[in-house]
UniProtKB/Swiss-Prot annotation:
One of its GO terms (biological process) is replication fork arrest. Component of the fork protection complex (FPC) consisting of tof1 and csm3. GO terms for molecular function: DNA binding. Residues 584-597 have a biased composition (Acidic residues). It comes from Aspergillus terreus (strain NIH 2624 / FGSC A1156). Residues 950-992, 1054-1063, 1096-1106 have a biased composition (Basic and acidic residues). This is Topoisomerase 1-associated factor 1.
Length: 1147
């Protein structure tokens, strides 16, 4: 305001020139100044005046973002004084006049729609809008009252009549003008449905005339409902661009309406109102009773003020005679006077207050309820599927006509109509049960009337919208989406109990798809845990959703015990960024490399465990959400109180986590709900259940406090996961640590590479394809430094040899492989391709256990020249990475290593027969089971035979029957002779005639000899780091040797005896399986057993140790050939299970 403005001087809210121009146009439009005072007379140029008024609205208000013209038109009473009389005159006798039709169209289309457009208050509006909006909202209520009830003129029917010619034209022949007329007619109906009395403005007795009931009655009487039903049922065919406007009209007609009351009969509605009145009277009586306990007497109504001396010697003042009763009442009065000025966070300003308000209940009179129920039933029968299918598709493809608010309106309308359909079915069943018709005449309706919102597309759209709203913290949208999801679940639950088999199958399929996704479970849990201060409506929606979802999921999981869900977890991978800079400076590029972590979804199925899922709701945040809802217990109905009771009962007694409820404020709330003051109504049926629950909970709390007095201190605070389990059960939760397993060992496909250089090329190409160039560069640097170090040692040793020719040659020291950083150290354990490359460049791992952080070394037998050759190969492959062949990537040329030795060695022991020789099994026909071969060898032989047969099919002629029979007889004779040798060698051996004392003496003598030899080899490997190359070569061939070799069998027998002393009885299943952990030639880097820690040579080369031991036993490599008739099972092997010898029954 201007400072020079005199006191009492009026403020011009509108420019006087603008007001003068607008008033002159309204005056020139026409009036009631003719001979007949009840008849409106148009001015000489009324059509031009209407166009000028529209031009002022568009070029002044819209262009300058002001509301001056709209206010001037409201002050001049343009709508009720001019426009509505013009429409009335056209309806009563001038419908055939083209001039009057154009004027009527101008009144409706060009002026009524902008003047009745909803006004929304938001934070960014200018001061001019804030000055005019209260007045314009008041004027719009007057506009609505005039449109709904103007004498005997049905103005809504007149407005619809103006648009009928445009509707009669087919969609293909409809012009842009026709589409605009239809759209503006629907917008006018939408504006009428939205306009309501503002509670902050002074009312003038027109609340009933502009209420929701009056709107619904006018829509029914003037055929607006018939128009809406016609257009909704033909959406997509004749009307494609009007879907969003129709949705808004339907939304504003049904929002806030109680579905249960809507479908009640007159008798039920009257009984309901009687019950509500009785409940209000009982509340009033209880309040009076509470007041009467502490009310003053007739002669003691004087003011009272007392001082209360507290424990800390401070004084507090309390007023009122009710504090004189006792100390408890005084303290309670003090608590009521306390206020906690909690700092409030700035709330996000909603741009559309009118459209968000679907939580406020709306009361309808009986006539309006009947009219709206008729419209809803006809809409469900004809217009539900077309409208909501078309709206969903438009929202999904983000059409231009779609606004942000339409998604919220869509989900709320779907939820409301689904509840209406379920309520209608209940009323139909009740009506039929009360009728005199036979039950067999009643045919249940199918759920196909609402099938458009029960398909997979709707579920995907709903889940995506819920996740987006939750991430963006759009709580109003999430509220509507939660309501929709809840009603879908309840509808599916009713479909499952339908007598129609088709509905039951559809319900089963829908439940399977809803509960299959674990992301849905996690989202509902996150919504419940994420409640903060979103309001009562949001709190009601999220608690109802969690209650219904848990109940249905529990029932479904019990009916489907083998229920599977798809679990999605994040698997991190590193992706190298493209480097920019000088290409020649390779070292600088390597040092400046950056890595970006990306998360990709990895999906897998797993068995669903309902107890595990329900336990996720046992946390303090979920409990706080339901406690916040319980604080409204005075306003909650029986269903809501039952929902709270079921959750708290599940927490305290089903999940055995009652300690979560042991908090002072929660216990105080439960106590006040039962004992008061201001407790629950004891006449409600749910009161008894709550009373028993609170009694049992307090009893358990007292018992827990007696057991663990520390709980008294914990009652002041929320429980945390680290102490919650101990407070409940009295001991810490036992957890099992899971160690990381090494990745599966990879090899290069033999068909793709034969030489080591080709294998290195393929592995490096695969690493480069994965963006692991840094690891290859690090490996090249390790080889370079190792070559320099080895070369320096060789030069030093050569110089020492020249000085002292008799000096023995010192072995090369092992060179440790040091990772560059922690990521590289992790890759050395978890990256299977890098481990394969390290093995190809002759690196070796120290120790038996393959664990994170295991040491790798450059072995002693590699010379500096060998290391430089390997480095040159790696550098060449890194400079020009292998890109693969035409149809195969380098990664496809790698495969998992097939453990042939283990399977081939373990198989014979599983095929040993333990039958009694004296029972007739030693007949020629059943000498012994066929020669057991390893699975891997048999598979390879079978593949070779098949390939040979395929190659020779076209060359050789088919054999005759005589030749085939001769070959079969020869095979049988050969097999019989081989089985005889195996049986005699296995069951008859030299140890049968020996006594136990002699066997023990021989065993200990061999053990002492072997221990000395092993200690000497360990000492040489640790101190000198040298193992003969001959031992390596011999060891490799010996590892391929079958354990049927007599020397190996004899040696393994002694080791097996030692194993019997070390392996506990619990491992008898492992022994019977045929796996012997320490058998020579059978050990692998991946196996783990208790016997690996028996020796002190964990830091020695396991590979060299085995090869040297094998070379000592087997001699030269040339003697390692096996005869075809050599038995597979070791002749001297003794096997035990639980202390019993099971090699032979004769012993």
């Amino acid at each position: 305001m201007d400072e020079e403005l005199a006191f009492g001087q009026t403020v011009e809210v509108v420019d006087p020139d603008v007001r003068a121009h607008v008033y002159s146009l309204v005056t020139a439009l026409g009036g009631f100044n003719g001979e007949d005072a009840d008849k409106y007379v148009l001015g000489d140029d009324a059509l031009a005046c209407l166009r000028d008024i529209r031009r002022w609205l568009k070029l002044y208000d819209e262009k300058y973002n002001r509301m001056d013209v709209a206010r001037c038109l409201g002050e001049s009473n343009l709508v009720n004084g001019d426009l509505l009389p013009i429409l009335s005159a056209w309806w009563h006798g001038n419908q055939g006049s083209r001039y009057m039709s154009r004027i009527a169209l101008a009144c409706k289309v060009e002026l009524l729609v902008p003047l009745t457009w909803p006004l929304e208050v938001h934070a960014e509006m200018p001061a001019n809008h804030l000055r005019h909006i209260p007045y314009l909202q008041h004027v719009q209520v007057l506009y609505k009252r005039g449109l709904l009830s103007r004498g005997h003129t049905p103005l809504l029917r007149a407005i619809i009549r103006i648009a009928l010619p445009s509707m009669a034209v087919s969609r293909s022949e409809r012009t842009t003008r026709d589409e605009g007329i239809l759209k503006l007619m629907l917008y006018l109906l939408r504006n009428i449905a939205i306009i309501s009395t503002n509670a902050r403005l002074a009312a003038e007795g027109d609340e009933e005339e502009t209420s929701r009931s009056a709107t619904i009655n006018a829509f029914q009487e003037q055929d607006a409902f018939a128009l809406l039903l016609t257009m909704c049922s033909n959406v997509g065919d004749d009307f494609t661009m009007q879907d969003m406007v129709l949705l808004e009209i339907v939304f504003h007609l049904i929002k806030g309406v109680d579905v249960e009351k809507l479908f009640m009969s007159d008798a039920q509605r009257s009984a309901k109102r009687t019950d509500e009145l009785s409940e209000l009277l009982s509340k009033e009586t209880s309040l009076r009773r509470e007041y009467a306990k502490n009310a003053p007497t007739r002669h003691g109504r004087f003011g009272t003020m007392i001082w209360v001396k507290r424990d800390d010697a401070k004084m507090s003042t309390v007023s009122g005679q009710d504090v004189l009763k006792d100390s408890q009442a005084t303290l309670y009065k003090m608590d009521q006077s306390k206020k906690w000025n909690k700092p409030k966070q700035r709330q996000k300003q909603e741009l559309s207050v009118v459209n968000n308000d679907f939580d406020t209940p709306v009361h309808l009179n009986p006539i309006a309820s009947k009219n709206l129920r008729m419209f809803v039933e006809e809409f469900l029968d004809s217009g539900f599927n077309p409208l909501f299918t078309h709206v969903r598709k438009a929202i999904e493809r983000e059409a231009d006509r779609v606004m942000d608010i339409n998604s919220r309106q869509y989900f709320y309308a779907v939820a409301w109509f689904l509840e209406a359909e379920r309520t209608r079915r209940v009323r139909q069943r009740e009506k039929h049960s009360q009728s005199e018709k036979a039950a067999k005449e009643f045919e249940p309706d199918s759920f196909s009337l609402i099938a458009s919102v029960l398909n997979q597309e709707t579920f995907v759209f709903l889940n995506r919208s819920m996740q987006y709203s939750f991430d963006q913290k759009d709580w109003a949208d999430l509220n509507a989406e939660m309501r929709c999801f809840t009603q879908i679940l309840l509808t599916v639950q009713e479909m499952a109990t339908s007598p129609l088999e088709e509905d039951q199958e559809i319900a089963e399929n829908i439940q399977n798809r809803i509960f299959y996704e674990e992301t849905t479970h996690d989202r509902i849990l996150a919504i419940v845990r994420g409640y903060k201060d979103q309001g009562y409506g949001y709190l009601d929606a999220c608690t109802e959703l969690s209650h219904v979802f848990l109940r249905m999921l529990e029932r479904y999981s019990k009916e489907n015990t083998d229920m599977q869900i798809r679990s999605r977890r994040r698997a991190k991978r590193k992706k190298q960024l493209e480097q920019k800079g000088d290409e020649n400076n390779g070292e600088e590029q390597d040092s400046e490399e950056e890595e970006m972590l990306e998360a990709e979804r990895v999906s897998k199925e797993r068995k669903f465990d309902f107890r595990r899922f329900s336990a996720k709701f046992c946390n303090q945040k979920c409990v706080d959400t339901f406690v916040s809802f319980a604080r409204f217990y005075r306003e909650l109905n029986s269903d809501q109180l039952k929902r709270l009771h079921r959750y708290f009962y599940r927490i305290a007694f089903k999940e055995e986590m009652s300690v979560l409820l042991f908090r002072v404020d929660i216990i105080n709330l439960f106590y006040r709900m039962i004992k008061g003051p201001g407790g629950m109504d004891s006449t409600k049926p749910i009161f008894k259940e709550w009373e028993e629950f609170v009694r049992q909970l307090i009893r358990r709390m007292v018992k827990k406090i007696d057991q663990r007095p520390a709980l008294i201190t914990e009652m002041l605070f929320s429980k945390i996961n680290s102490t919650m389990y101990y407070l409940e059960f009295g001991h810490e939760k036992q957890t099992i640590s899971v160690t990381r397993r090494p990745p599966a060992e990879l090899v290069v496909n033999p068909n793709d590479a034969e030489t080591t250089e080709d294998k290195i090329k393929i592995v490096i190409g695969a690493l480069v394809k994965d963006g692991k160039n840094r690891l290859v560069s690090w490996l090249s640097g390790v080889l370079d430094s190792a070559a320099d170090e080895r070369e320096a040692f060789e030069i030093q040793e050569a110089a020492e040899r020249e000085e002292n020719t008799r000096a023995s040659r010192a072995p090369n020291p092992m060179i440790p492989v040091e990772p560059s950083d922690d990521d590289c150290k992790n890759e050395m354990f978890s990256n299977a391709k890098l481990r394969l490359l390290m093995a190809l460049v002759k690196f070796e791992r120290l120790g038996v256990e393959d664990i994170p952080g295991a040491s790798w070394v450059v072995p002693a037998h590699l010379s500096s020249a060998d290391i430089r050759d390997i480095k040159s190969t790696v550098d060449k492959c890194l400079a020009d990475p292998f890109q693969g062949t035409f149809d195969r990537e380098p990664q496809a040329m790698l495969q998992r290593k097939f453990q042939r030795e283990n399977r081939g060695s373990f198989e014979p022991t599983q095929e040993v027969s333990f039958g009694n020789d004296s029972e007739g099994e030693d007949t020629p026909e059943f000498l012994f089971p066929p020669n057991p071969r390893s699975k891997s060898n048999a598979l390879e032989e079978l593949k070779k035979k098949r390939k040979k047969c395929k190659n020779d099919d076209g060359e050789k002629e088919p054999l005759d029957e005589q030749t085939i029979e001769e070959r079969r007889r020869a095979r049988e004779e050969n097999a019989r002779s081989r089985q005889a040798k195996i049986k005699s060698d296995l069951y008859v051996h030299a140890s049968d005639e020996e006594s136990d004392d002699e066997a023990d003496e021989e065993f200990f003598r061999l053990e002492e000899k072997r221990r000395k030899e092993q200690s000497e080899r360990i000492r040489q490997a640790l101190l000198l780091g040298k193992v003969e190359e001959l031992a390596n070569k011999a060891g490799k061939k010996t590892q391929r040797k079958r354990p049927s070799d007599p020397q190996i069998a004899g040696d393994s027998e002694s080791q097996n005896k030692r194993l019997r002393q070390d392996i506990p009885e619990d491992d008898d299943d492992l022994i019977m399986g045929g796996s012997e952990p320490d058998s020579p030639g059978l050990q692998t880097g991946d196996h783990d057993s208790d016997d690996d820690l028996r020796f002190e040579d964990d830091l020695a080369f396991r590979r060299n140790r085995e090869s040297s031991a094998a070379s000592d036993r087997n001699g030269p490599p040339g003697e390692a050939k096996e005869d075809e008739d050599t038995p597979v099972a070791a002749s001297g092997r003794r096997r035990m299970r639980a202390g019993f010898v099971i090699d032979s029954d004769s012993e």
